[in-house]
Curated annotation (Swiss-Prot):
UniProt-listed InterPro entries: NA-bd_OB-fold, Rib_uL2_dom2, Ribosomal_uL2, Ribosomal_uL2_bac/org-type, Ribosomal_uL2_C, Ribosomal_uL2_CS, Ribosomal_uL2_dom3, Ribosomal_uL2_RNA-bd_dom
Bias type Basic residues, positions: 210-220
Chain's role: One of the primary rRNA binding proteins. Required for association of the 30S and 50S subunits to form the 70S ribosome, for tRNA binding and peptide bond formation. It has been suggested to have peptidyltransferase activity; this is somewhat controversial. Makes several contacts with the 16S rRNA in the 70S ribosome.
Organism the protein comes from: Coprothermobacter proteolyticus (strain ATCC 35245 / DSM 5265 / OCM 4 / BT)
Full protein name: Large ribosomal subunit protein uL2
CC annotations in GO: large ribosomal subunit
Subunit structure: Part of the 50S ribosomal subunit. Forms a bridge to the 30S subunit in the 70S ribosome.
Span of the signal peptide: none
UniProt KW Transport keyword: no
Ranges for region Disordered: 203-276
PANTHER family in UniProt: LARGE RIBOSOMAL SUBUNIT PROTEIN UL2M, RIBOSOMAL PROTEIN L2
NCBIfam families in the cross-refs: rplB_bact (TIGR01171)
SMART domains: Ribosomal_L2, Ribosomal_L2_C
Keywords for this protein: Ribonucleoprotein, Ribosomal protein, RNA-binding, rRNA-binding
Amino acid sequence: MPVRRYKPVTSSTRHRVVIDYKSVITKTEPEKSLLAPLKKSGGRNNAGRISVRFRGGGHKRRYRIIDFKRDKDGIPGKITSIEYDPNRTAFIALVTYADGEKRYILAPDEIEVGDVIISGEEAPIRVGNALPLSKIPTGTTIHNIELYPGRGGQLVRSAGTWAQLMAKEGDYAHVRLPSGEIRLINVKCKATIGRVSNLDHENVSSGKAGRTRWLGRRPQVRGTAMNPVDHPHGGGEGKSPIGHPSPLSPWGWKTLGWKTRRGKKPSDKFIVKRRK
């Protein structure tokens, strides 16, 4: 998938690298029946307090209802269009099934308009098809993986990512995730064959602060530039050191390398190898 690099005509185009959407997107208007309103939170929770810092503003969006469950087993569907989704890094594909129903799915890499996909235990091993892990050969590249049967895909959904089915042992399959973690997942859980689309997303550079603001992201202020009341690194005269043996988060936790995962989680028994 090509990217567009701009000539340095202005300071904002000097480092700008964007996805060449015209070479990928086949339809600009979304399917109205698969849209839902999406209200902005500005990073606030139900109490009105900031729960995620540096969020707010951005262009208005409508949510695209995505079929993560892929539960239309045995019914073939034809890829009608590849579309842009402002709510995720990957592209989405509009699928028209043989019974007339339309659904959005995460667009796998190398999928094209006109391709036919199908889900279910008898589906062939082909890019875009969704099967239980028990029916997928070991070594296959997969994405949109369920954690619990029937809940819908929760793992490996962002642009350009993929996982690999390493082995099967009894009721569980060994899956290597993009982080390097090897995890046990029930073989009844479904996964989609192939990689997620938009592999060049990692090469994108906004080029200017304004493009980041369009996405709803506000400037990230350094802790050393704050007052002591706002951050453990704050205060001091001029460019003074942070005043602590190691860097701290705004809430006083050690950061930059300090492991924050809680010990003795119920899911620990499903992790064969920790992430790198």
